[in-house]
């Protein structure tokens, strides 16, 4: 008997999360002898529990699927919904009853760390209660902080956007001779992968950004002041890139120097404002012109500066998820394994989601220079293949054509 697929998107969106959705849908449609319909959860688990879902295989035609592949954000909508820790909670029988009513045999959840926690809990409940539904996680996060995978879909495009934008900011900052400091704040609560990508903006050694600070290295305000002064002595226009999650040796976030940080439903501190704190500090210390720029959500939603490599890998992750489930895998996450050799190649493999969820891959400290203000050449070798390739997209009236859920 044919079984149906259900797929959801969760957490913060990316420029390529819909490419993974595309991969799941296409793989499902290509196996009509095994797959009935492909359903999509509207607003993830939270929406599904409210009986909000749609039949994607019936709704989207081939042209729409191709547009979906290059549409940023999350077509199905997202959520930040934490499943109960206690697997005896009444939540679980209810959701499994809903899945059984739709004759779901394969469940795919596209997301980051917290989404893998969801896959872990559902797969463990299924195993303990004799359910044959197979649960697979499809990775997604611009933070690139999932363990047991070379990188995550979404990171390459976000890194490309960061590098391109910082290069343009550096060009803009260079037009005046008066001393000035531009501080660019980038996403990254505990992992500095995105901020590290700012160094790719440099055309030559010595180009801006002159100073780069990641959460993996303790941040000291007084040393920062000395670093900025030394940079201003070197050239009049200094661009500094900082992660939102930089903290001092006591673990206090720099953004908390200005105000207390709130937390989200998973208990993560909602960080913003480190750039503003540093802007005021340097202005008061040196009296030079200072501005802070917070790229914010544009890092994850920009569809015009995407990596074609990232799009194709995200789609392949979705396809690989379906293939793994049909072969019997459950409680697994699709991961990328980089092959050895001078030419960049990777393969999709499966990893135990229980070993991945609630863990965090930090930026390698050995890739950070000893003074904590720059990134070493190892990162260039790692990151450049991920940002290569430009997408040829459909345009209308000078603007990109995207797919909107109706």
Question: What do the PLM-derived regions correspond to, one by one?
Answer:
Residues 1-53:
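N-terminal phosphate-binding or glycine-rich loops at protein starts, especially the Walker A/P-loop
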Residues 10-12, 41-46, 80-81, 112-113, ...:
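Short, ordered loop/turn segments at secondary-structure junctions
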Residues 14-24, 48-49, 84, 92-93, ...:
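Short glycine/serine/threonine-rich phosphate/pyrophosphate-binding segments
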């Amino acid at each position: 008997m044919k079984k149906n697929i259900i797929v959801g998107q969760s957490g913060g969106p990316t420029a390529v999360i819909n490419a993974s959705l595309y991969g799941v849908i296409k793989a499902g449609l290509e196996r009509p002898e095994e797959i009935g319909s492909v359903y999509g959860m509207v607003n993830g688990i939270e929406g599904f529990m409210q009986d909000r879902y749609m039949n994607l295989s019936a709704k989207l035609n081939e042209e729409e699927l191709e547009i979906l592949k290059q549409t940023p954000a999350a077509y199905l909508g997202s959520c930040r919904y934490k499943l109960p820790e206690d697997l005896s909670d009444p939540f679980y029988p209810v959701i499994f009853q809903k899945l059984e009513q739709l004759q779901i045999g394969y469940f795919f959840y596209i997301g980051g760390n917290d989404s893998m926690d969801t896959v872990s809990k559902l797969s463990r409940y299924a195993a303990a209660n004799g359910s044959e539904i197979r649960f697979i996680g499809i990775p997604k996060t611009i933070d690139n902080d999932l363990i047991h995978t070379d990188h995550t879909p979404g990171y390459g495009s976000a890194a490309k956007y960061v590098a391109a934008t910082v290069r343009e900011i550096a060009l803009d900052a260079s037009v005046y001779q008066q001393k000035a400091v531009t501080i660019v704040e980038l996403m990254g609560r505990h992992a500095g992968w995105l901020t590290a990508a700012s160094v790719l903006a440099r055309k030559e050694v010595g180009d801006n950004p002159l100073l780069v600070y990641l959460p993996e290295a303790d941040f000291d305000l007084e040393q920062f002041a000395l670093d900025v002064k030394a940079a201003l002595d070197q050239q009049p226009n200094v661009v500094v890139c900082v992660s939102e999650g930089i903290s001092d040796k006591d673990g206090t976030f720099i953004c908390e120097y200005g105000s207390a940080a709130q937390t989200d439903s998973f208990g993560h501190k909602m960080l913003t404002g480190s750039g503003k704190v540093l802007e005021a500090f340097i202005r008061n210390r040196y009296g030079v012109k200072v501005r802070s720029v917070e790229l914010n959500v544009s890092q994850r939603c920009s569809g015009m500066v995407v990596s074609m490599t990232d799009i194709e890998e995200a789609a392949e992750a979705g396809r690989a998820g379906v293939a793994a489930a049909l072969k019997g895998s459950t409680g697994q996450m699709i991961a990328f394994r980089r092959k050895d050799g001078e030419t960049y190649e990777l393969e999709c493999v499966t990893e135990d989601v229980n070993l991945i969820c609630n863990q965090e891959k930090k930026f390698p400290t050995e890739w950070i220079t000893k003074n904590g203000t720059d990134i070493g050449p190892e990162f260039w070798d790692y990151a450049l293949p991920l940002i290569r390739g430009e997408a040829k997209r459909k345009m209308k009236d000078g603007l990109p054509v995207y797919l909107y859920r109706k």
